[in-house]
């Protein structure tokens, strides 16, 4: 388990490129036949990926010991979105078939967590966010057909994008975790611009659907102290509450956003005008 400490905004603005990447970038999300796990002190979120190829992958008691409990979800909830081939997640003996861009919410108290791919040649890529939970909500599958896509932006400003809200109160109950998937239209490059911060939640982005010769310049920092991190395909970035989180790519891309914190009000954000950025 890779543990990332919290960092003050005054400290963050003094960091060079390497230090910024060390603090906020998660470079390796998917590793064959393993799970990856990054524990952030910021709102205690855990972020990672699971890619079964030649055999199933189980998250067992070894993780619980690192969290001071018996199992990962003794005091946590888990949200998973599959960005790879078809697979399944077995929760306490119950199999849930999870296809490409299907998602599964797993509530507090689940013990057995086993992840499998249907085909080794096209393995599932289970990306997950995990957050502290105060009560148990039912495990539930969410497919793209269950979410109401919202298209925002304009081709003229290169920010036309479709937002798919998977884990939000209108779709299912969670303790604090929100997750969704945003896809840029072809030829569009900007996400979340004009940008914002939200004092009551932190956020993590996973960028994917990127070609090998492309990248995203992820914008972060306080609005008057902006920095950037160069992102490649299937990499994630941690965004503290005080930081903007926006990006511009060399080509169109897709990203998954996950939020934890004080509330789940999607529009609870502090907007930043473009002319106020520095």
Swiss-Prot record:
Chain's gene name: kduI
Family: Belongs to the KduI family.
Keyword Metal-binding appears in the UniProt entry: yes
Designated name of the protein: 4-deoxy-L-threo-5-hexosulose-uronate ketol-isomerase
Disulfide bonds: none
Reaction catalysed by this enzyme: 5-dehydro-4-deoxy-D-glucuronate = 3-deoxy-D-glycero-2,5-hexodiulosonate
Keyword Chaperone: no
Note describing how the cofactor binds: Binds 1 zinc ion per subunit.
Binding site residues for Zn(2+): 196, 198, 203, 245
Pfam families membership: KduI (PF04962)
Record lineage: Bacteria, Pseudomonadati, Pseudomonadota, Gammaproteobacteria, Enterobacterales
GO BP annotations, alphabetical order: D-galacturonate catabolic process; D-glucuronate catabolic process; pectin catabolic process
UniProt pathway: Glycan metabolism; pectin degradation; 2-dehydro-3-deoxy-D-gluconate from pectin: step 4/5
EC number: 5.3.1.17
Cofactor(s) recorded in Swiss-Prot or TrEMBL: Zn(2+)
